[in-house]
Amino acid sequence: MQRQRTAYHAAAMANRTLQMTDALVDYVHRFGVREHPVLAALRDETMKLPEHGMQIGPDQGAFMSLLVQVSGAKRILEIGTFTGYSSTAMALALPAEGRMVCCDVSREWTDVARRAWSDAGVDDRIDLRIGPATETLETLEADSFDLAFIDADKPSYDAYYEGCLRVVRPGGLILVDNVLWSGEVADPAVENERVSTIRALNEKIAADERVDHVILPIGDGLTMARVRPA
């Protein structure tokens, strides 16, 4: 009986994601990431800003960098650049001929990003578009990107997702950040515009026959969706 209980407990634990304590997060950052010096300096600089919570962590940056490499992406679209951690991480993983289009509404934040791009030697690969991303999306050619990353204002997430479905080629990837929103998406007692918008998009993608997808419990939750061929 004890063996049965032990086996059941082990099976249950195997199907669950670990609770990430601060100590475990630190362990992952120490041994699971090789953070580029420019990224480390940028992370430290951004932590001094009141909005530092908008920055992705080094583990997510490393994952996205590796994803660029294994997917062979050469054209990347980023919606929501902030101070440039994610764009720098992905641009460093691009081949020499690779290019990125980054969309943001803030010159103040993206001035920090520009310095990081220059320090990392990737500024020639990045085309920064200042203005509403919905308008920028309308100017981009269909099927012209291999990968898109959405990490901007949550009320516009659905519009960004639909726009990315148009501009990302079949077989390409769409990444959506903050899809778990500190766990609040799973708490029925929490009702606000941001959480409701994220829940609605999560449910939409789960039922969307245009993509294959998975929600990864990395950072604040990351959806990875592959655009199915028509």
Where are these regions (language model features)?
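Beta-strand-loop-alpha "switch" segments that mediate conformational coupling across diverse proteins
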Residues: 42
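A glycine-/small-polar-enriched, mobile loop at the entrance of the PLP active site in fold-type I
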Residues: 26-31, 48-54
